[in-house]
Amino acid sequence: MDKNLNLWDMSTFIQQYGALTADHPTHTPEDSPQTVPSPRSSSAHSPEIQELRSLQETRPARLGARSQSRSSKHGLQQCSSSPSDESFRLHAELAAWCERVETKPSLLAKLGCCAAPPVVGDHREQRREAMERIMRCLDAGQAGTQLTLRDLNLSQLPPGLHRLAHLRDLDVADNVNLTRLPEDLSLCKHLERINADGCSIAALPSKIGALKNLSEISLAFNELRTLPDSIGQCSSLTTIVVPGCKINKLPASLANLTQLKKLDVAANIELSELSPHMNLDDVAVHSTQTRLGLMHRIFKAPTFDPETRQRLSYQASALRDRWAALSHHLSPQARARVDQMREGASTTLSSQDHKASTAWKTATEKVSSWAEEGAPITLDRIFKLNQLLLPEGDDDNDPIGGQLRKVGIQAAPSNTWTECRYPPPETLKDEMAKFSGWLEHSEQQAHARDALGHIEFAAQLHQRLVSLHPFDDANGRTARLAMDWALQRHGLPPAPPVGEASRLPASFLGGKRVSPEKVVLETLEGIATVMNQVHQ
């Protein structure tokens, strides 16, 4: 068969294979001539051939609908396609696409024009349904902004999607045999949202960067190992959702996406790096079940304008001087009120848990002795604090103190598995190493800090420990005792939490961020509250 046969040119088709309607004479046993339909004749009435004829007959009428304009200067005629002609072209492309996977082998397949269709998965591909939806979208004109091809068991996307001039939203999710998004998808210039969750996509168009209006792309649970470099050219992109894939590397070009607000790469267990040039200040990164250690990149030192810093510095110095005058003459009742305020920040201590209360008192005494000695705050001592707060018990299920957690956890109350998740356990070793480096550097600068500087360090220490949540339990109590240690070592009183920022100072990669300035201000307020309690 001629492989270059134009399936839509019926004259060529007939010349190649003969008239499909011709009847061939034959003879009965009595040698009486009869006419019986040939196999080709019977096939001529199949839906496929009828559609071919219909297209061939309507083509001249459609082509005649073209609008023409003549240039008098050059004597040349220019033709532009009318909507009806565009519809014909798209219909022809889709009809040919459908021919390749009919439920029954088509006549063209019998003749060798295309292979007989395999069954894809447990069901046939619903290409006819996809074709009808596309044509309805085209016929809708400006209202045809959405196209849903979800769960049609497609192994490839239909051709001609770029002919849908008003397409904004494309949903091809749950086509489990779909392995790639075609290159010509980058021609859909007005596309804003793509949902291809739950497929088997291993490759995106290399020129996807041409989609300048694309704002959201969701490719959860696919076979992707990376994203094309050109995605960094999608200047309107705000959301990238690719959890549950096989991504082990992300392009550095993501740093160019200045509008990006959400990057969900959860459950890509081989992913360990993100471009250092990517600004995470305004990007929520969902990194559960990855090896991405990014918390050190969202921790910031507090910054105040000169006027505010001068005012706060004066206030901090005044509080330190007042505490120095009062701390050696506190009555037992005043000390009890301060301790009650500190314990009230913990739901565990507030629940009258005798074992936890005893451990808290032991750890508090240890912090006081370290503060009096002027002992530097180190990572080893913070681990020791957590161990004191979680003494070994008789129950094998009790959390073990002083060890990094090995499970993923989230803040409570929370109804999301990404937005309020603490760092993955796979990243904690590296995260704590970076935290230890920050501690050492801060300790070296301690002699140069004023009272406000000591409060800023204590507030950051509290926030960073709570945000990392490195232990199985007692993370909040460990962080508060570490903060009190940092304050008491420099002649300041403990600072019980008094506001939302100081009670819940954690910042999350995937969601809420608490400014360090707010934590510092509420730490100052907590110190002032202690002073008021002492005066009563």
Curated annotation (Swiss-Prot):
Induction remark: Transcriptionally regulated by HrpG and HrpX.
Gene Ontology terms: cellular component: extracellular region; host cell; host cell plasma membrane; membrane
Subunit structure: Interacts with several members of the Arabidopsis RLCK VIIa subfamily.
Lineage start: Bacteria, Pseudomonadati, Pseudomonadota, Gammaproteobacteria, Lysobacterales
Enzyme Commission number: 2.7.7.-
Keywords: Host cell membrane, Host membrane, Leucine-rich repeat, Membrane, Nucleotidyltransferase, Repeat, Secreted, Transferase, Virulence
SMART domains: LRR_TYP
Localisation per UniProt entry: Secreted; Host cell; Host cell membrane
Effect of H469A: Lack of uridylyl transferase activity
Family to which the UniProt record says this protein belongs: In the C-terminal section; belongs to the fic family.
Signal sequence extent: none
Catalytic activity: L-seryl-[protein] + UTP = O-(5'-uridylyl)-L-seryl-[protein] + diphosphate; L-threonyl-[protein] + UTP = uridylyl-L-threonyl-[protein] + diphosphate
Species this protein is from: Xanthomonas campestris pv. campestris (strain 8004)
InterPro entries given in the database record: Fido, Fido-like_dom_sf, Leu-rich_rpt_typical-subtyp, LRR-SigEffector_domain, LRR_dom_sf, RLCK_Uridylyltransferase
An example molecular function term from Gene Ontology annotations: nucleotidyltransferase activity
Domain Fido, residue spans: 377-533
Domain notes: The LRR domain, the Fic/Fido domain and the uridylylation activity are required for avirulence function on Col-0.
Gene: xopAC
Broad EC category: transferase
NCBIfam families documented for this protein: XopAC
Record-given protein name: Uridine 5'-monophosphate transferase
Gene3D superfamilies: Fido-like domain, Ribonuclease Inhibitor
Region (Disordered): 22-84
Bias type Polar residues, positions: 31-45, 66-84
